[in-house]
């Protein structure tokens, strides 16, 4: 069984955050989500047991 993760770059109150959402067979696993202020830290945490499938920069959509 392969776990996939999407990393979302978002802006909350003028602070950039990277949020990883983990999925198995298209169902999100809420207790496996992770948030950090850097992409590298988020990716390092997620790559322990997941494949990163998508990166979505939500800050570009806000502008």
Regions found by a protein language model. Name each.
Residues 4, 59-63:
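Short acidic DE-rich linear segments
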Residues 14-32:
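A short, structured beta-strand/loop element
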